[in-house]
């Protein structure tokens, strides 16, 4: 069975609308593409996410990345399953001032744990802004 036909962009957008907390919805994360174990999302510039210096705050970057990976994990599984973040670690490499391109990659899809890597690039310059490693538990 082709999992991408059963869990594509429309299903992922519905997932974001139905299971995330209200404040997560305010990130306005846009799904760009979904494929086997890799997904791309766009975090648009939003003044609600900006801190002093006119850059997107780190908390918003990690929240958007975590949310994007949750969608990627559900997509790889092929149907909705409860999961939770076990560990997430972020290295900020440069300020993100114009919005971000978030690229997720699942490194291991186990029966109980899922390990992933996320990179966040500046949407205008394509320069790497953050590198994130993460682990999720399948409940």
Regions found by a protein language model. Name each.
Residues 1-139:
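Terminal targeting signals and extreme-terminal segments of soluble enzymes
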